């Protein structure tokens, strides 16, 4: 491991949706930089924690449930006080507006947007006491695109940008930052199978 980039030594980071894809890559990068990393997902992300090694800690978390967040805020203290929260968990079913039902709309908002509020509710108080913290929300560059069948997803991801801007202002005097990151289409298992030609064309 390259110790020259261990800029997060002594910090504890929490990454949601860390079983695979972007979340797993972020968790591994934070660990490489010296952080203790709490990795969460709907199913226990054992593989990610194992790849990290002794500084990786796996917890099961449904980001839509406030009780799960409350429980995690207590259990995570065994690892340490959380300094960095990376909200990466996402839900993105393709539905045309004609086929979009309220249950799908609400699940999309709960997963993609409510989770950011809940993480702040339960981890912001500790950051304020320590006068240091980082919130990172994984949004999407799709907020600036017109994609058929994704109105609910785009709305939720635009909401992340707005929430992070507001949160950043609320915590600016406490040594805490809040930022949204808008990645483009990323070659992960979540986007489904791709032919080699498709991969070359897109990625």
What does each model-found stretch correspond to?
Residues 12, 19-20:
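Conserved glycine-rich cofactor-binding loop
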Residues 91, 98-117, 132, 136, ...:
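Catalytic Tyr-X3-Lys loop
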Residues 96-97, 104-109, 191, 199-203:
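Substrate-binding pocket helix/loop in short-chain dehydrogenase/reductase
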Residues 98, 145-151, 173-174:
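Active-site loop immediately N-terminal to the catalytic Tyr-X3-Lys motif
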Residues 120, 156, 164:
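Active-site helix of classical SDR
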Residues 125, 169-170:
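Alpha-helical segment proximal to the catalytic Tyr-Lys
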Residues 140:
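Residue(s) in the substrate-gating loop at a strand-loop-helix junction
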Residues 144, 182-193:
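Short, flexible catalytic-loop segment of classical short-chain dehydrogenase/reductase
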